[in-house]
């Protein structure tokens, strides 16, 4: 059973293929960055992939039918993304020896930066999403009905 109210606007069918394509692009950037050692050649690559990941996870959270997206709960989305990012950082720490040899101090700094960028990416998306819902509640992006 969905936790959205009956008056919530449905997500249009074209949003899902776009979100899946976006997610695949972010995965390709991440794993391509590992495979071709882009992370070590471009200092900003990690920032790019984490900010794009934060945007993508926030989009999934906002567009899933079981996720309530009223203004009060919209504030929580970046915090949930931060928690998911923290989980990923634990995974990364456990398996880092396979692809990188960092000191613990450097890893702690990198983790902090990654989590900030995850949070900022999510905050950017939720701010855009919240404003879009507020200004155009029946917009083409957020509803299957045509815009007024």
What positions do the PLM features span?
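Bulky hydrophobic segments
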Residues: 1-109, 119-148
């Amino acid at each position: 059973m969905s936790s959205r109210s009956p008056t919530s606007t449905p997500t249009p069918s074209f949003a899902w293929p776009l979100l899946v394509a976006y997610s695949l692009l972010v995965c390709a950037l991440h794993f391509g960055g590992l495979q071709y050692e882009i992370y070590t050649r471009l200092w900003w690559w990690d920032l790019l992939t984490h900010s794009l990941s934060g945007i993508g996870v926030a989009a999934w959270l906002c567009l899933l039918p079981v996720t309530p997206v009223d203004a009060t709960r919209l504030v929580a989305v970046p915090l949930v993304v931060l928690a998911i990012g923290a989980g990923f950082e634990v995974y990364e720490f456990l398996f880092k020896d396979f692809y990188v040899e960092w000191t613990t101090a450097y890893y702690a700094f990198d983790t902090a930066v990654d989590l900030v960028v995850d949070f900022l990416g999510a905050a950017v998306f939720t701010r855009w999403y919240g404003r879009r819902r507020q200004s155009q509640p029946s917009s083409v992006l957020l509803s299957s009905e045509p815009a007024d």
